[in-house]
């Protein structure tokens, strides 16, 4: 009795002591290969962390580190940070971090830090605080291979894995498929990483192109299965997450699931209770508590196949049954089979060779897959659109040139100087050709040609427009009626001078700028496996380009000034101020769009599109403004309209009265005595504009002037009476009209003293 009481007291003392002894805190840190949002391998580990924290009501919040496979520096920094923040249960969930995990476990083996490290065998060093997590998915892969073999319509299945060091999973998948279909063909490739979605997807596409309709994988995300689903076949859930919840039962045939919650709770409890099992080893299995199980089938899977697969799963729950290790094909890899016809588990895990197949089935290994670097050109729609639009505009320019040449003697064309109209249209054609070249893929030739064509095209276009209207301004801005002889041949050197300045700047740009085509990656939303060509130059080339822009800007400003000055011209055929001003303003507006694009970082495709569209739109609108009204008047009023050049002022009526006088009609315009105006007698002479070719010689010109003088003498018998206030104004307008008409067409200048 006394002994019984003593035992009870000891038990009570023990439990009371345990209650008062403060338990250890457990702070979990999980190191992941990728992002926990992958709804796959990393998601399952992170979910187990969260659940364990909730179940155990841990006071210290746990930690997680993601994407550690991206760089060794990031991985090492994560280990250091976890230790610095007081984590005492560190879970290394990535095989890629196993070596570094063992390194830090060795460094801190005397510290109160415990480790769960994913690997297949105990480390060589004695590290009692390290629990090995042998994530053995061989049975799961064998089962999925069996399912794929039964479901395959092509008789070809495949496998994508990080590398040859993980060949065991692929061999298990192949042997499962061969168990289901003896003549199966197996194709495989490696990605070089557990987590590289781009490479995994492209590798899967490559296997699918070789006939595979079901693919297994050892990847931490679903990129491989996305490629399978995109090809129209059923994917397999191989990340540990019930992927039918993401892609739907119609797309996922079967998934295996991993649930690590029990593992986290188990080892965290050991840390809290200070009951850590030295050098522990945890291996996954299909048995209850083994962390592996299968999700439900897709409704597209026939019941007969479901029954066969379920049967196989039940057999595989026997840990002594290892069909993935027991096959004569291992002999071809240099292994010896034991009495049961199997290789050892260690040999199976460390094997880095793909099985070679037998007389019934074959295997094809494509080795490590690398994504070929892909050239990304400008979009075909953009190139086609700009090319077609520019070609149509070139056709319109050619038609306009033909019209100008055919109807060059028509008053409306002749008054605008056909030679300069021709130059303007040629400049526009160069601009449109430059736009076509600008939209093509850059190379050394196109990088130079597109700038040359656009710049020279605009120089000829604007230069001709500027010079021909500068002549109009000089002739009409002449209140003292000074004799000014400005023929086309006197204007051509000015156009040539402007063009020479442009060519000089372009030569400097090309000679010193090192203009070239370069291949670039990482621009325009390109992936690291894509590149495009862009035009490039050095600093001297950039300076020359800025000078070129300033040069064109000055031309625009001068053109704006001249278009403003010729607004006062009251003869419609010579007054092109409105279309010129509109053209210049539109070009200037677009220039304020193009310049910022050229000096600021923008999408290359956007730059090209904007520049080409602005060039086409401004040039086309300018053509319509400058030539549309002329052609319309020729169609509606005839080619020889406005024999005396219509004017909105008194000069026009005076010209008409003089013309009537010449044909025998008398002008009764006498000044009235009521106005007290002095009558002035004026000798009438012909003031009609006479047009002739610029190529006529001086003899013909002299003869024409003599004939005009004879007509003036013959008509001098009658006087024209005009009010004094009208005489000076009318004389100015008439003389300017006559002078401009003659000079536009190469005739000899007539002095105002002849009137």
From Swiss-Prot:
**In what ranges is there compositional bias, type Acidic residues?**
694-710
Signal peptide residues are: 1-23
A GO MF term: GABA receptor activity
Cytoplasmic side residue ranges read 407-417, 477-492, 563-578, 629-755
| Localization, UniProt | Membrane
Q: So which residues have sugars stuck on them?
A: 16, 183, 273
What membrane topology term does the record carry?
Multi-pass membrane protein
Membrane-spanning residues? 386-406, 418-438, 456-476, 493-513, 542-562, 579-599, 608-628
| Annotated region (Disordered), positions in chain | 656-676, 691-729
Provide a GO CC annotation, any one.
plasma membrane
Q: Give the primary localization class.
A: membrane
A Pfam family recorded for this sequence: Bmp
- What GO terms describe the biological role, i.e. biological process, of this protein? aggregation involved in sorocarp development; G protein-coupled chemorepellent receptor signaling pathway; G protein-coupled receptor signaling pathway
Q: Which residues lie on this side of the membrane: Extracellular?
A: 24-385, 439-455, 514-541, 600-607
Keywords from UniProt, A to Z, are:
G-protein coupled receptor, Glycoprotein, Membrane, Receptor, Signal, Transducer, Transmembrane, Transmembrane helix
Q: Which family does it belong to?
A: In the N-terminal section; belongs to the BMP lipoprotein family.
Annotated protein name in UniProt? Metabotropic glutamate receptor-like protein B
Q: Which organism is it from?
A: Dictyostelium discoideum (Social amoeba)
UniProt gene name: grlB
